[in-house]
């Protein structure tokens, strides 16, 4: 008998084939968390996804580095249903910091392609979040002291834009008010970045419409006092994100899932900002525009926000949208710390997937720990499998 250590296909180096993705249930899944989910042409082997997390570690031209290959690759090897690359700017002034990811020029594709190639060599799914920071752009990395990044620091404090000229706070640059033409041009930039993401080979694209960045600040009456086609009524305030959604959906394959991260509420007093009722109304329009899944976050749009932070504090927002809007999938995110909790969210019908961020940084083997909590038998990388249950004959 000849034993061959079969290699992964379509990769320029040897790495063992992972015929069963790490994190996939072996046999019939016993829980919703480990039940595969198919969205358009992509099947996710479980429903615990890695949220996009900014690391402020790209070079000053927006290129990802070997740090990101290791950071994202290591999380992907440990079996989440999807790894989402951090907020990636569609234009240079759309970065949060000088060290943010970008996809506004072709040279930025090469390091991203390496990351995607590695994820696929491990039989894992990977997506990218496309973003514009708006009035929250040109700041320093928070772990270096959160303030305005000056030109001497690689910033662009005189080239920051938002729906109006109001600063987020004293630690942010004074923005210029975007013209209608500039909004129109940004729609095109989202499309160009999306086409590049498709060419690179990403499985999913997410549009960042949350946390006070450009889309979020444009839709909220607390931060948009415009009186042109992009301001005033609810329909006018959501015009920009809907143009982005429609244009991106047309530019990417029908088989490719499109996600949208939303701020469910500004966490301001009633009547003063964007509220969950607005998100419910937007969700129906996003569905009709071709969005497949809404990733439900909150806050980040106004300095006077009063967020009631606790475990799973944003899950009720996802649940409310799910109860009121049919035909679109919902993702819950925020302080989801373990598999028991994640599975309960899904089993009770509050959401269709869970997004987890900081807990993956604390515990890269969260998927395996969750499986053990729930009594699920899941695959693990062939190189690591003997550390889990001995040399199992799984593949």
UniProtKB/Swiss-Prot annotation:
Catalyzed reactions per annotation: A + NADPH + H(+) = AH2 + NADP(+)
A GO term for molecular function: NADP binding
InterPro entries: Aldolase_TIM, OxRdtase_FMN_N, YqjM-like
Signal peptide: none
Key words of the record: Flavoprotein, FMN, NADP, Oxidoreductase
Entry cofactors: FMN
Superkingdom of the organism of origin: Eukaryota
Entries under Gene3D superfamilies matching the protein: Aldolase class I
EC number(s) stated in the UniProt entry for this protein: 1.6.99.1
Binding site for substrate: 208, 386
Chain positions recorded as FMN binding sites: 208, 358
SUPFAM superfamilies referenced in this protein's UniProt entry, alphabetically: FMN-linked oxidoreductases
Annotated active site: 213
Short name of any one Pfam family annotated for the protein: Oxidored_FMN
Gene Ontology cellular-component annotations: cytosol; nucleus
UniProt similarity note: Belongs to the NADH:flavin oxidoreductase/NADH oxidase family.
Record's subunit section: Homodimer or heterodimer.
This protein's name: Putative NADPH dehydrogenase C23G7.10c
């Amino acid at each position: 008998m000849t034993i061959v250590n079969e290699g992964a296909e379509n990769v320029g180096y040897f790495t063992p084939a992972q015929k069963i993705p790490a994190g996939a249930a072996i046999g019939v899944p016993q829980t919703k968390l480990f039940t595969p989910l198919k969205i358009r042409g992509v099947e996710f082997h479980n429903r615990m996804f890695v949220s996009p997390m900014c690391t402020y570690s790209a070079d000053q031209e927006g290129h990802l580095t070997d740090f990101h290959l290791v950071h994202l690759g290591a999380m992907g090897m440990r079996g989440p249903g999807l790894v989402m690359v951090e907020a990636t700017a569609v234009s240079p002034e759309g970065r949060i910091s000088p060290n943010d990811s970008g996809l506004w020029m072709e040279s930025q594709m090469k390091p991203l392609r390496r990351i995607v190639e590695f994820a696929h060599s491990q039989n894992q799914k990977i997506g990218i979040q496309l973003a514009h920071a708006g009035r929250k752009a040109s700041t320093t990395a928070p772990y270096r002291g959160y303030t305005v990044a000056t030109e001497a620091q690689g910033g662009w404090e005189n080239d920051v834009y938002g729906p109006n000229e109001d600063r987020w706070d004293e630690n942010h640059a004074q923005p210029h008010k975007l013209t209608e033409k500039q909004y129109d041009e940004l729609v095109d930039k989202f499309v160009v970045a999306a086409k590049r993401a498709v060419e690179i080979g990403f499985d999913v694209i997410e549009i960042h419409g949350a946390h006070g960045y450009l889309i979020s600040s444009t839709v909220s009456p607390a931060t948009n006092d415009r009186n042109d086609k992009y301001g005033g009524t609810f329909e006018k305030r959501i015009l920009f994100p809907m143009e982005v959604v429609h244009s991106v959906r047309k530019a990417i394959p029908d088989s490719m899932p499109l996600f949208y991260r939303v701020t469910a509420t500004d966490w301001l007093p009633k009547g003063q900002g964007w509220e969950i009722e607005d998100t419910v109304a937007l969700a129906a329009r996003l569905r009709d525009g071709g969005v497949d899944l809404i990733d439900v976050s909150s806050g980040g749009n106004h300095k006077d926000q009063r967020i009631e932070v606790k475990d799973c504090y944003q899950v009720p927002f996802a649940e409310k949208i799910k109860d009121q809007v049919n035909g679109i999938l919902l993702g819950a995110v925020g302080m989801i710390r373990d598999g028991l909790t994640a599975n309960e969210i899904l089993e009770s019908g509050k959401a269709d997937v869970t997004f987890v961020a900081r807990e993956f940084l604390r515990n890269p083997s969260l998927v395996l720990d969750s499986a053990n909590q729930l009594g699920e038998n899941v695959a693990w990388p062939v190189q690591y499998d003997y550390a889990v249950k001995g040399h199992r004959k799984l593949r």
